[in-house]
Amino acid sequence: AGAAVSESGSWWLLDSNCKLLEETTAEEAKKYPVLSGVVLTAPVSGCAASAADPEQITVAQTLLTAMEQWDLVDVITTVDLSKLYGIVLWYGDRFEIDLGSTDNLAYKIQYLQEILKNLNDGQSGVIDLTFETETVARFLPW
């Protein structure tokens, strides 16, 4: 599974292609990145996930595929897609990763993986990958 998503009190696992794998428990869901801000519509095991905002599914698929490719699925705890102009990932409680808009998401995830390699274990803060002014990441310690 690539991620977990909560729907009306129940939890679903989905793969990186956003296919719903199975319903699961809240405890089991904690083992995967949680997609927050996504409202599933009529989830059915074995079918493609659909959401009230279909673009969220497209964005989730891009992010989950990139996270899988760059070995970040095990360390990202939350993928917040409630605002597609302000996407936020959480690396446990150590890092808030601001991705900004949906532009260049796969590149931003690749860039993130490089940044994480260079941060010390004791560091925590915000990793800004919004690229609002230039294509440069900024680290803002807490």
Q: What is the role of each PLM region?
A:
Residues A1-W142:
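Charged, solvent-exposed interaction patches on well-folded alpha/beta domains
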